[in-house]
Amino acid sequence: MANAIVEKAKERMTHSHQSLAREFGSIRAGRANASLLDRIHVEYYGVETPLNQIASITIPEARVLLVTPFDKSSIKDIERALNASDLGITPASDGSVIRLVIPALTEETRRDLAKEVKKVGENAKVAIRNIRRDAMDEAKKQEKAKEITEDELKTLEKDIQKVTDDAVKHIDEMTANKEKELLEV
């Protein structure tokens, strides 16, 4: 029963890491990355549809994304969605494909994005600490209900803290790597 608490906390922390990785993937780093377009939804036959479900996204060059719609009639809808997005990238269409050239980041933009990365990383660490608190509360509840002994509670708290420390360390590494990637010229 006690290990279940640690495993559940570990699983929730893994989900936080995955969420952070997705969020970092959507932060533009001056080079083409298909995950930049993950948040783009296109109104396709009256339904909001994720872009990657109605078009293939390829990276022919380091700073170019190529969007090839499966249905050529949807190209105007895709262009409209890309223009309305907060990417800051103007799509260029030749009628069958849409080319997105990722502009080089200015030094100021790089610093702003690095601040954003730090903020997102801090939010992820807060989520990890909340998971730790929930796990600790569950362990204390079990000890109070006499399901585990006081010694088992102390061991469990140490295990939860170790898992938390590992998760926070991993988030720090992810954040540092993303910052380094952003600040590279």
Curated annotation (Swiss-Prot):
Subcellular location as annotated: Cytoplasm
Assigned keywords, A-Z: Cytoplasm, Protein biosynthesis
Pfam families, sorted: RRF
Molecular-function GO terms, alphabetical: ribosomal large subunit binding
GO biological process: translational termination
Function: Responsible for the release of ribosomes from messenger RNA at the termination of protein biosynthesis. May increase the efficiency of translation by recycling ribosomes from one round of translation to another.
Family indicated by similarity: Belongs to the RRF family.
Protein name: Ribosome-recycling factor
Organism of origin: Streptococcus sanguinis (strain SK36)
